[in-house]
Amino acid sequence: MKPLIATSLVSPQRAGPGLAMPSLSLVACALMVLVAAGTALVNSYYLLLMTFAAIYMVAAMGLNLLTGYAGIVSIAHGALVCVGTYATAIASVRYGWGFWPSAVLSASVGLGFSVVLGLPALRLSSWYFVLITIAFTLAVTAMLNDLRGFTGGYGGIVGIPKPSLAGVRFDGFGLFALVGGVAALLWWVMHNLIDSRIGWALQSIREGDVRARANGVSTARLRLFAFAFSGAVAGLAGAFYASAKGVVTPEDFSFDFSIFFLFVVVLGGPARLSGPMLGVAAFYVLPELLDSLKEYRMIAYGVGLLAFSVFLPEGLAGAIARFDDRRQARRATSPAATLPRDAGAATVEPVRGMALAIRGLAKDFGGVRALDGVSLDVQPGSIHAIVGPNGSGKTTLLNMISGFYPASAGSILLDGAEVVGRGPTSIARLGVQRTFQTPKLLGELSLLENVRFGAYARERSSGLEIAFRLPRARHEAAALDAEALRLLALVGLAGRAHEHAALLPHGQQRLVEIARALIGRPKLLLLDEPAAGLSMGELDELGDLMRTIRRMGTTLIMVEHHIELVASIANTVTVLDQGRILAEGTPEQVFSSAAVVHAYTGGAR
């Protein structure tokens, strides 16, 4: 049952995360399950076809986590299915292992190969990694013949047993039902992972890891997790492939076998839970059922791929989701409300503000000195504003405090602890949160999910607890959902909690980003131009919000151009000009300084 595939690749646009499957996708998938079960009962050919379709769907779900959600393109997935297949074949036929121990071995082998394969991805660019996966796939294909003492060479391995449990042998429809049950269980696990801090962090890494690292995510560990999960699932699918086929040969695992899985994910709908099922149905089951039109099948397949690249860049699942979103929007009777800001909504525990001391800080970019000997002190629980002309080094200073830029010279002390040399993940876990000049939200997550993601470093549930929704994970998620909703009420957006963040105007996206930072219970909050793009009314609300955050105990450092806002809320103002401190003091002292006025108006210092 080798799938028919094409030999060209369509690069999709980013798809939505599919955290809650849209209703039309749910209906489509439910219908396909019923059709598959009914078709499998027709005759042995259709039964075998549907069994392999379920196996391919299991394998594709693993690749969907890696490529769809984490954004790491791999051509090696078919090769990992291959090593899992041969692990079960060799263990069961040559060493007499039962199916279940062999399946565990296959999953372990797939996991091990995938992690080793993924290590270079932590340092290489995406396209270099694609080349490595291609080389790995070709190497595995070559070794199937070269290591014929283990693999049987061109003759392959025959007599692979079927699974059995408690004396019941799974064959025919029983094997189809078993694989279908495994696919359903894996879908549930995937749903739980994606609808959690793990899934949100993976999508954040896919969009660029700045946001993820600012939230305390260890991006390297999470990428390795994606590789490990994907490889283990591929190996497990290989075990079922070996058992269903009964005989495995190198011809089953040509290079296009790996390309097939990438097509299933990309064209079925990357980062959509329903994508693998739709992809397998469209690009494996349908071509097999059209075998009578074999003469024209490749033409139709090529035309179909071209049509997908032009008209359905988000894949089948993405197209269904978009249509469903529009349908539901037309049925909505009223727009979502933007509620007044509730200053008493955030009943989080007070925090102890963090003290910051900077001494002789300098930053060089090539031959340009962006910061030159900056020294300042920020008192715990205060609002400290950093102002100055464009290009004076304000954002550079925030990037150095938060660990995104290494210091060329000088010292940064947070509560007396030196943090120069630490990365953003480590500093975030000390209690430092930040926002950015351009809001960095995950556009197709809801506002609630975006805020929840800010609690990444606070959560204590393990990945296993999240995957199987064990009690601690459920209770922690419920508590954080409630806290996120309170913080959205604090910024006046509780009425839009379940809308996609991409639908918000720029100013409200900034407020969501502040709420996301607050759920991490920061001791120090860095705000980069929070007033940019806000109306006068929104500026007043932002000022009230800053005062509320200060009352919680959090220390705020704010880079801002809006002088009136700074003058109304800041305890201390530091003025930077050409990378050096020009003035420091209360807002009244600073903004009445002739040197500051000259710096802003372009006069000589």
Question: In which residue ranges do the predicted regions lie?
Answer:
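Transmembrane alpha-helices and adjacent helix-loop boundaries
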Residues: 2-336
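A short, surface-exposed alpha-helical micro-motif characterized by mixed small hydrophobic
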Residues: 566-568
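Helix-to-loop junction immediately C-terminal to a conserved catalytic motif
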Residues: 402
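Conserved catalytic motifs of ABC-family nucleotide-binding domains
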Residues: 521
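Catalytic Walker B motif of ABC-type/P-loop ATPase nucleotide-binding domains
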Residues: 525-529
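The feature captures the beta-strand-to-loop junction immediately N-terminal to the Walker
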Residues: 387-389
